[in-house]
Each structure stands twice: as C-alpha cells, then as structure tokens.
C-alpha cells in the first residue's frame, strides 16, 4: 500500500524532537511492506502561511505519487491538508487526533476547518479512550477508533546506557520530558520537588517557562534532545514525572515504564488507561499536596521497577 503521511510536526536536524513520535510509525509501516511518503512541516513558529504550503505540498504529492490512502496526524491543520490531498487523489483519508488539536476546537479557525475533516474522513482515530470520548461528544454520530502509537520495546529496553546526570546530582533523580509550557504543569512539578526536599530534578525539553525553572536549587534544564537520546535520560533517572494539567495520552510515561521506571502521571487524560498501581502514581495535577505525596510514594518504589515494564507491554 502507498501511504501519504501528512503532519504539521516532523523532526529535522534543527528541531530533532518535533513530531519524533511519528518516526517509529513510519519505520514499522515500511517494515510491513508499505511505501510511505511524507508531506510535513519541520519547524516551530513562523508564519501561518506555512499551513497553506503544507496543503499545497500534500496535494502535489497526492497528484504526483498517487497514494492508496492519506494518513493525516492532527485534525487541524494537517487534517485539512490531508483532506485536500485525499480529494485530489480520489482516495480515503484516515486522520488521527493527538490532543492539542481537540483542545483547540473552541477556537474559530480550527473549529470551522475541523468539521469537514471529521465528516470527510473514512476513519477517525484517537490516541486514548479519553480523547475519543471528547471527540464523540463534540461530533454526535462519530465513532472513533482508539489506537495509541505505543512504544517500540526494542528502543526502550532495560539496560540502556544512562546519560550523564547533570552535576552527578543526588538520588532520588526525577526526570520530566516534554515542552516547558503551562499545560505540562512544569512549575507545579518544580514547586512540589522543592517541598520534597531531596534529590535532583532534570527537565529535558524547552519552552516559554524555562526561565521559571532555571536557577532553582536541585533543578537543571537540559533543553531539547533528539528522541533517540530520550532512553538514556530515562535510564539515568529513578522516577519519570508527567503531572500535566491534561495529557491526552502520555507517551513519555509509557516510554519510562518500558524502561522499568516508576512514573508520576496525571489523572486528567490518557495515563489512567495504562498506569497501574505497581507501575506508578496517578495524581490530580491541580492538587499540590497530592503531587508532593505522589512524589514521596514514587521515590519509595523500586528501581528498576519491573512491574512498570509488564504494564507497558
């Protein structure tokens, strides 16, 4: 099968972490014998005209390459670009929602442009039952497939060489992987860590809240790293923390569990669907006392935590 993958997030040399979760998907589709071509945006920021260019690129690829199906990631704007490409080639559109696209549906442009995508797609996929429920409530009559992208257990296998922990910081070593934005609750995590009163906390990622984290005692911000380096960072930590205000799926938590690491994850979104009591601690992200208590419980769990990998598999 010839698959045209359309997305507004795809890694590049300049931004190796952008949409890196899609790389294993392409690899596995090709391993199954499918041909995959990508129409994508590979940088953050810039003019909104980049979305028009994505649509033009996707339509050109569809007309030139003649795929059997268009597979768009994110309802908007990639979904709209994918719908145009599918119509140009006369083939079905499959679109996958990842979370931020659904959160943006209360804004006028995404709301107006997403409805025809949902109605015109042969299949709509959500990465968690929680996200599927939100979509189905918004679009009566819609029946979402639920299929997360998962984790390749070969890439996130116990025994990965650990990264050098900044300053050889003390245990317990806590790690947070992701964008440093309000939704990820990174400041709340740093505040809870300060109240924990011991250990070290490393953030792998970047974003507008970096300045609110740097300079705190025991806290280091490493910045963005290629996705291939994430297993080494997880292997170096004792606990992976993802107490987001909302997390539609929670890929970083699943990756950590695959590497036998305990996780602290949010109750808001997808993590309750796979984080078991033996694998980690679920906390209400806006409850500061619960987050502090969750960190206390998590750092008392075994390292490595073999039950976490069992749950991830």
Language model regions located:
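Conserved donor-binding/catalytic core segment of Leloir-type glycosyltransferases
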Residues: 4, 167-198, 202
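Acidic anion/phosphate-binding donor-loop and adjacent secondary structure
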Residues: 105-106, 151-166
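Carbohydrate-associated surface elements
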Residues: 130, 150
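Nucleotide-activated donor-binding/catalytic signature segment of Leloir-type glycosyltransferases, i.e.
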Residues: 211-228
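Short alpha-helical donor nucleotide-sugar binding micro-motif in glycosyltransferases
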Residues: 224-225, 232-237
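Aromatic "clamp/platform" in nucleotide-sugar-dependent glycosyltransferases that forms part
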Residues: 245
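Short hydrophobic beta-strand element within catalytic cores of glycosyltransferases
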Residues: 262-265
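Conserved acidic donor-binding segment of nucleotide-sugar-dependent glycosyltransferases
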Residues: 277, 281-288, 297-303
């Amino acid at each position: 099968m010839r698959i045209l993958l359309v997305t507004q997030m795809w890694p590049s040399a300049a931004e190796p972490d952008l949409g890196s979760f899609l790389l294993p998907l392409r690899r596995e589709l090709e391993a199954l014998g499918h041909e995959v071509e990508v129409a994508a945006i590979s940088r953050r920021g810039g003019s909104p005209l980049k979305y028009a260019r994505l649509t033009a690129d996707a339509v050109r690829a569809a007309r030139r390459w003649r795929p059997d199906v268009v597979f768009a990631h994110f309802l908007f704007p990639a979904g709209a670009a994918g719908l145009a490409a599918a119509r140009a080639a006369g083939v079905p559109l499959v679109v996958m929602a990842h979370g931020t696209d659904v959160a943006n549906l209360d804004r006028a442009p995404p709301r107006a442009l997403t409805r025809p995508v949902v109605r015109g797609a042969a299949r709509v996929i959500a990465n968690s039952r929680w996200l599927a429920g939100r979509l189905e409530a918004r679009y009566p009559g819609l029946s979402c497939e639920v299929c997360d992208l998962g984790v390749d257990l070969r890439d996130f296998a116990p025994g990965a060489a650990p990264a050098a922990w900044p300053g050889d910081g003390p245990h317990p070593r806590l790690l947070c992987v992701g964008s440093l934005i309000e939704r990820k609750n990174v400041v709340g995590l740093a505040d809870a860590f300060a109240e924990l009163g011991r250990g070290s906390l490393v953030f792998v990622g970047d974003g507008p809240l970096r300045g609110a984290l740097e300079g705190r005692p025991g806290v280091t911000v490493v910045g963005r790293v290629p996705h291939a380096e994430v297993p080494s960072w997880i292997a170096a930590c004792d606990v992976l923390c993802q107490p987001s205000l909302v997390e539609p799926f929670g890929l970083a938590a699943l990756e950590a569990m695959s590497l036998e690491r305990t996780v602290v994850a949010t109750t808001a979104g997808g993590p309750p669907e796979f984080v078991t009591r033996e694998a980690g601690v679920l906390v209400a992200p806006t409850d500061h006392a619960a987050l502090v208590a969750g960190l206390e419980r998590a750092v008392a769990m075994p390292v490595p935590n073999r039950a976490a990998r069992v749950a991830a598999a």
